Amino acid sequence: MSAAMLLAPGDVIKRSSEELKQRQIQINLTDWTEGETNKESKAERKEGDKAEELKDGEGRNRRAARRKRAAKETKDARCDRRIHTAVGSGSSAKGPGERANENVDRGDGKVGGGGGDADAGVGTTGANGGRWVVLTEEIRRAIESKYGTKIDVYRDEVPAQIIEVERSLQKELGISREGVAEQTERLRDLRRKEKSGAHAKAAERGRRKQGKKPHGDAQREGPEEEKTSEEPASVGITIEGVMSQKKLLSMIGGVERKMAPIGARESAVMLVSNSIKDVVRATAYFTAPTGDPHWKEVAAKLQKRRTIRYTSTGGDVKTEFLHLIDHL
C-alpha cells in the first residue's frame, strides 16, 4: 500500500497530532468543537439577554412603586398637616432585589506531600560487590534493547544477586505473559531450594574450590564446616524486587534509548483526516467510540463504499491508532 489516506474520528486524530507530526504525516482535521462552542456562546448570550430584560423590568417596576408611594405620602401629608408636620419623607425599606454581600473565604490550602522515591540510592553493584543478574532470557533481551546495558541471566551460580522484575516494570519493558510466568517459576524453584539449604551447601563448595580452606586443615575444621553448611541460603542468594525504571537503571547503569519515530517515508500513511470530503479518496478507516458528532455520517459513507475498516479492540484508542499507522 503506497500513499495511503486513513480516515479516523476527529478526537482520535487530535489526541495523536504530536505523534503524527513526528511521523511527518499530514493532518486534515475538520474541527467540530468551534461550531459547538459558537452554539453554546449564542445560547448563553440569549439567556443573558433575557436575564437583563427581566432585571430591567423589575427595576422599572420598583421605581414606579417608589414614585407611587412617594406621591401617596405627599398627598397624605397635605391632607393632614396637623399630624404630619414633623414627619420626614425618607424611607429605610430595602428594595426586594437587595441582598447581603457574602464574603466567603474558602481557604483552599494545598497540602504538600513528601513524595520521595523509595527506589533511589541503590548502587550499580549488589551488597557483596557482585553484578546483578536476571532470571530469564526475555528480560535480559528487553533490558539490553531498551537501555543498551548488557546483563547476565542467572545460571544457578552461588553467590548471586538477582533482580526480580515486578509488575509495573514488566509493562515498561514489554515482557510477555510467558516471560512473566517463567520468572515466577524460577523464583519458586529458588525459594524451594532455599528451604532445603541446597544453595548454602553450593556456596560452601564454591568457597572450598577457590582454595579458601587448605586440605591439611580439613580434619581440624570439620565441625566448623558443618556449621557453615547449615547457614541459610540468603548468605549466597540476594533477590531484589524492582518496580521502577529509575531503580533498575541505578542498579545496572545505562540510560533509556529514545526510539526514532517512524517517518512518513517508512509508513504507508501520508494523510489522516476526519473530513467527509475525503471519503472518496480514503484507502482505509479506523473507527472507535468518539465524541466527534460528524463521524457517524462519515463512517456510514465509508461503509457504503466498502472501504477497508479497522476497529478499536477496546484498549487505549490512541495507541491502537498509532500502531495501525505504523504497520499499514
From Swiss-Prot:
Q: Which reactions appear under catalytic activity for this entry?
A: ATP + H2O = ADP + phosphate + H(+)
Q: Give the main location.
A: virion
Gly residues: which segments have biased composition? 110-128
Task: List ligand-binding residues for ATP.
Answer: 110
Q: Where is the composition biased (Basic and acidic residues)?
A: 36-61, 71-83, 96-109, 180-205, 214-230
One term under GO cellular component: viral inner capsid
Q: Does the keyword Transmembrane helix apply?
A: no
Region of interest: Disordered: 31-128, 180-237
- UniProt entry tagged with the keyword ATP-binding: yes
Q: Which family does the record claim for this protein?
A: Belongs to the orbivirus VP6 family.
According to the record's subunit comment, the protein's assembly and interactions are: Homohexamer.
Q: Main role?
A: ATP dependent RNA helicase essential for RNA packaging and viral transcription. Possesses ss- and dsRNA-binding capacity.
Q: What is this protein called?
A: Helicase VP6-A
| Taxonomic placement | Viruses, Riboviria, Orthornavirae, Duplornaviricota, Resentoviricetes
Q: Which gene encodes it?
A: Segment-9
